């Protein structure tokens, strides 16, 4: 996926926020085909790895599910080693003739680490514990970074508020938000 081309990202916003001992992964429910909303309650955030890992995806749905299945297989091979599983998936994604054609991005997190995975072979861990991908990702990221300094807000509170802001701004993001908490 050309991560510089927002056209490939239409239809999703995924946000991961880590604060204190809590991790919240949120995703909106809108699926768009061109300029048309075809579904408003899609579930783009999932628990994987025996429930110890949360993953969110942006991009082509079939491609994202293929990558999610591959990541689950890597987690079975490398239990409790999210970083290693992500690196192994990224290597496969980059070098496999079939996988490298997949157009999706993933945000994955466990209780201690969070990563963005791209088809370019990137496994990126944020410095501030916040990841955002998809068409509304930059809006959600900016909102979450502003809200992280507010005392008394949990990771879930920040994720929900930032997703609302992203949904207010991005036409490819709606307010039907799914949140998974670790």
UniProtKB/Swiss-Prot annotation:
Main location: cytoplasm
Localization, UniProt: Cytoplasm
Subunit structure: A double ring-shaped homohexamer of HslV is capped on each side by a ring-shaped HslU homohexamer. The assembly of the HslU/HslV complex is dependent on binding of ATP.
Record flagged with keyword Lipoprotein: no
Recorded superkingdom: Bacteria
A GO molecular-function descriptor: threonine-type endopeptidase activity
PANTHER family tied to this protein: ATP-DEPENDENT PROTEASE SUBUNIT HSLV (PTHR32194:SF7), METALLOPROTEASE TLDD (PTHR32194)
Classification via HAMAP family: HslV
GO cellular component: HslUV protease complex; proteasome core complex
Name the record gives this protein: ATP-dependent protease subunit HslV
């Amino acid at each position: 996926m050309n991560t510089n081309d927002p056209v490939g990202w239409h239809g999703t916003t995924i946000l991961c926020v880590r604060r204190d001992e809590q991790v919240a992964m949120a995703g909106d429910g809108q699926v768009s085909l061109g300029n048309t909303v075809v579904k408003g309650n899609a579930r783009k955030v999932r628990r994987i790895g025996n429930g110890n890992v949360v993953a969110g995806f942006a991009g082509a749905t079939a491609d994202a599910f293929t990558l999610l299945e591959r990541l689950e297989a890597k987690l079975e091979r490398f239990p409790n080693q999210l970083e290693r599983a992500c690196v192994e998936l990224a290597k496969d994604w980059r070098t496999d003739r079939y996988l490298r054609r997949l157009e999706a991005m993933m945000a994955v997190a466990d209780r201690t680490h969070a990563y963005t995975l791209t088809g370019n072979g990137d496994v990126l861990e944020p410095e501030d514990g916040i990841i955002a991908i998809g068409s509304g990702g930059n809006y959600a990221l900016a909102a979450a970074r502003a809200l992280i300094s507010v005392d008394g807000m949990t990771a879930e509170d920040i994720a929900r508020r930032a997703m609302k802001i992203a949904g207010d701004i991005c036409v490819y993001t709606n307010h039907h938000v799914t949140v998974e908490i670790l």
